[in-house]
Curated annotation (Swiss-Prot):
The lineage of its organism: Bacteria, Pseudomonadati, Pseudomonadota, Gammaproteobacteria, Moraxellales. The RuvA-RuvB-RuvC complex processes Holliday junction (HJ) DNA during genetic recombination and DNA repair. Endonuclease that resolves HJ intermediates. Cleaves cruciform DNA by making single-stranded nicks across the HJ at symmetrical positions within the homologous arms, yielding a 5'-phosphate and a 3'-hydroxyl group; requires a central core of homology in the junction. The consensus cleavage sequence is 5'-(A/T)TT(C/G)-3'. Cleavage occurs on the 3'-side of the TT dinucleotide at the point of strand exchange. Keywords: Cytoplasm, DNA damage, DNA recombination, DNA repair, DNA-binding, Endonuclease, Hydrolase, Magnesium, Metal-binding, Nuclease. GO terms for biological process: DNA recombination; DNA repair. HAMAP family: RuvC. The gene is ruvC. This is Crossover junction endodeoxyribonuclease RuvC.
Length: 181
């Protein structure tokens, strides 16, 4: 059964989420954040790299999904986000994982059925799809959503499974949910 790690990169908080995929079923394994908010940028990147590496070595995922950088209005923020993303990807690749990349819109479309969903909607759908009783922290939920998106994109999850998990929330959006990659 594939074990998928999702990464939501950030220069202060990098979210990670690990799920197990068994056919059309998903199981929560672990989620959290790598905190780097008090260090200078080189130390932050080191901490992201080491944190991702430690998590991968502990859990042994077989697949990885990382959220792509969006172009922020602030070029400095976009640069820092790109550096954090690079540190996370380098750690994954250093441990021989292939990395799938998805835009935030693709992830939201796959998980919520709506590419412009807000963070609260993503958190609620992650809870529903993984049968969680406690709402994950936003960065961890985004990382879990990236892993779920990858599970859907890898072809082992059927559209029907996702729509069943959505329940009443899928009404009116089922056609758009089929356009995920």
């Amino acid at each position: 059964m594939p074990l998928i790690i999702g990464i939501d990169p950030g220069s202060r908080l990098t979210g990670y989420g690990i799920i197990e995929k068994d056919g059309s079923k998903l199981r929560f394994v672990d989620a959290g954040t790598i905190r780097t908010e008090t260090q200078e940028m080189p130390e932050r990147l080191k901490r992201i790299f080491a944190g991702v590496e430690r998590i991968v070595k502990f859990h042994g995922p077989t697949e990885a999904a990382v959220e792509q950088v969006f172009m922020a209005q602030n070029p400095d923020s976009a640069l820092k986000l790109g550096q954090a993303r690079g540190a996370a990807i380098a750690a994954l690749v250093n441990l021989d994982l292939q990395v799938a990349e998805y835009t935030a819109r693709q992830i939201k479309q796959s998980v919520v059925g709506y590419g412009a969903a807000d963070k609260e909607q993503v958190q609620m759908m992650v809870m529903r799809l993984l049968n969680l009783t406690i709402k994950p922290q936003a960065d961890a939920a985004d990382a879990l959503a990236a892993a779920i998106c990858h599970a859907h994109a890898s072809g082992s999850m059927s559209k029907l499974t996702v729509l069943n998990a959505l329940g009443g929330m899928a009404r009116g959006r089922s056609r758009s949910s089929s356009r995920r990659r």
